[in-house]
């Protein structure tokens, strides 16, 4: 069957407005937020679950590769093509039009459709005094709920662990090339795919149709796991087979139509403590004591190094300001606008590369100072910063412990944040990742590339702060260290000097991490940046025996039936 026939059939399903074949207009869908870009025959944007199913069926019949994509906010290029060396044509299915969030069991659980975002879920749950698995970080840039599940996304919240569920509705292509719809949501929705998908979309089910004994809606064991600080393995990482279950961790090897998740009580009272020190052992002691001895685990414990603080202060200022003034729901629209501006800029040779970044960086120079003086004072005094958020009884636990541990000032300092300092500290921490990208765009003549590593250290690793050998360090302009300290998950961004082979540099760094017993990636998943470990490759092969959904992920083969 011809390409023209395929495009015609897809157009019949969604209408001409929602199929894009012009390469200049598909670029935003074919390019990752940080990494990955490649060709695609078309980008298709279904509005319903049934349209989604029919599109996948047509793609299977035409023997084309399917890459399912939601918000496309991943940092490792896992929901876009990567290069043009595939053995079949590619269709990208963007599911953001299929939004829908259904609260069940008195809002203690939720059904999320492919286009639902963490930000939307957070807003829907607030009136019920509940919140989703992740509420900061990925939620700020419009990440989808299902994208988080498919990638076992981690996030900042210590008490909840990686995004995980055992309840999902998905399509799987079996070894015979037959597409099967599997309803493991635990809800009686009918027998045929048409019945199941339509009934779910229109919420045509009753309380009696919902089973309560059909699996976990989050990782129930992580709270205990993260407290085991003497263990010689990481608390969480993407290749951990204990957290691979159907849709959970599938990385696009299934077409996921819905997931059923647990929600969590919203903390009525919280407090944030800002800690600064010049001794890494001080932060190790704090982490160990809080995880082992506190009755209540921290809500979050975010680390930021002074250099990352500086880069974010200068190159993340406008992102910080937009979130503070308008809220996170504006960011997806702004990212879309940014893509369109850059696309237009490429058409005119007299306009600079990275037009939107350069414009916004100029604008940011006229934005008033955004960080409180207290944060700047700690930046000037201390190299290492830890932002700890506590709730309930944990607030008093933290107050008493920090007052006794940092009593004389020899170990460092701390203060309990007021409302302005709390917001500023949190937003500043999450501006770091985008700030590195901005730095690369502004200094393109000096920067070869960013090597961005997502690392899970051993729970018992005392030497958590990296010291690079001179032969590596000499090739780097700046190193940005930040992460989820209580979980020992670190994001390490290296801005590489112009002229150096950044891929070779990354290879050398990964070898150093191997010697330390670290795992990578920790929570961003392999995408097209990391090589999938054997257990992860096995999981992908089991889910997608014909290798038709998102082939090449984790640097695996892109060929049909996993041919090498």
Swiss-Prot record:
Record has Flavoprotein as a keyword: yes
Name the source's superkingdom.
Bacteria
Q: Name one GO cellular component term.
A: extrinsic component of cytoplasmic side of plasma membrane
Specify the protein name.
Quinone-dependent D-lactate dehydrogenase
One record GO biological process: respiratory electron transport chain
Function field: Catalyzes the oxidation of D-lactate to pyruvate.
* FAD-binding PCMH-type domain span: 36-207
Biological source species: Haemophilus influenzae (strain ATCC 51907 / DSM 11121 / KW20 / Rd)
Membrane disposition: Peripheral membrane protein
Q: What is its EC number?
A: 1.1.5.12
């Amino acid at each position: 069957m011809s390409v023209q026939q395929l495009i015609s059939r897809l157009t019949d399903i969604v209408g001409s407005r929602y199929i894009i074949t012009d390469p200049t207009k598909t670029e935003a869908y074919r390019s990752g937020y940080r990494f990955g870009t490649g060709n695609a025959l078309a980008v298709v944007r279904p509005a319903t679950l049934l349209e989604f199913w029919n599109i996948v069926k047509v793609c299977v019949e035409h023997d084309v590769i399917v890459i399912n994509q939601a918000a496309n906010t991943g940092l490792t290029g896992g929901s876009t093509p990567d290069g043009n060396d595939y053995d079949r044509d590619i269709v990208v299915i963007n599911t953001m039009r299929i939004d829908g969030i259904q609260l069940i069991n008195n809002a203690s659980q939720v059904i999320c459709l492919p286009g639902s975002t963490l930000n939307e879920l957070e807003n829907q749950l607030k009136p019920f005094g509940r919140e989703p698995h992740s509420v900061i970080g990925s939620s700020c840039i419009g990440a989808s709920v299902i994208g988080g599940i498919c990638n076992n996304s981690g996030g900042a919240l210590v008490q909840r662990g990686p995004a995980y569920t055992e309840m999902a509705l998905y399509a799987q292509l079996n070894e015979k090339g037959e597409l099967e719809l599997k309803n493991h949501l635990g809800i009686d929705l009918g027998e045929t795919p048409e019945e199941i998908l339509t009934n779910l979309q229109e919420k045509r089910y009753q309380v009696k149709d919902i089973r309560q004994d059909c699996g976990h809606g989050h990782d129930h064991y992580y709270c205990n796991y993260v407290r085991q600080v003497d263990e010689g393995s990481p608390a969480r990482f993407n290749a951990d087979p204990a957290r691979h279950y159907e849709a959970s961790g599938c990385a696009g090897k299934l077409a996921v139509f819905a997931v059923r998740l647990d929600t969590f009580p919203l903390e009525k009272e919280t407090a944030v403590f800002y800690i600064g020190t010049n001794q890494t052992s001080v932060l190790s002691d704090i982490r160990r004591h809080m995880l082992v001895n506190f009755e209540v685990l921290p809500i979050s414990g975010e680390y930021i190094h002074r250099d990352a603080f500086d880069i974010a202060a200068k190159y993340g200022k406008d992102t910080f300001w937009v979130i503070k003034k308008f809220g996170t729901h504006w960011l997806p629209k702004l990212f879309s606008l940014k893509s369109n501006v850059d696309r237009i800029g490429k058409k005119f040779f007299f306009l600079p590369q990275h037009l939107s970044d350069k414009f916004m960086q100029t604008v940011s120079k006229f934005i008033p100072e955004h960080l409180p003086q207290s944060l700047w004072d700690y930046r000037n005094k201390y190299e290492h910063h830890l932002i700890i958020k506590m709730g309930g009884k944990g607030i008093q636990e933290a107050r008493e412990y920090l007052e006794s541990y940092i009593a004389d000032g020899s170990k460092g300092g701390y203060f309990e944040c007021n409302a302005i300092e709390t917001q500023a500290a949190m937003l500043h921490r999450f501006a770091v990742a985008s700030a590195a990208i901005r730095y690369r765009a502004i200094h393109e003549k000096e920067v070869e590339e960013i090597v961005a590593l997502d690392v899970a250290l051993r729970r018992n690793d005392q030497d958590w702060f990296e010291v690079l050998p001179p032969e590596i360090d000499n090739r780097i302009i700046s190193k940005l260290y930040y992460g989820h300290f209580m979980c020992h998950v670190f994001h390490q961004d290296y801005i590489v000097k112009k002229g150096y082979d950044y891929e070779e540099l990354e290879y050398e760094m990964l070898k150093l991490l191997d010697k330390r017993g670290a795992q990578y990636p920790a929570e961003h998943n392999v995408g097209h940046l990391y090589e999938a470990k054997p257990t992860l490759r096995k999981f992908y092969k089991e889910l997608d025996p014909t290798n038709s959904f998102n082939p090449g992920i984790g640097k695996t083969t892109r060929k049909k039936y996993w041919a090498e």
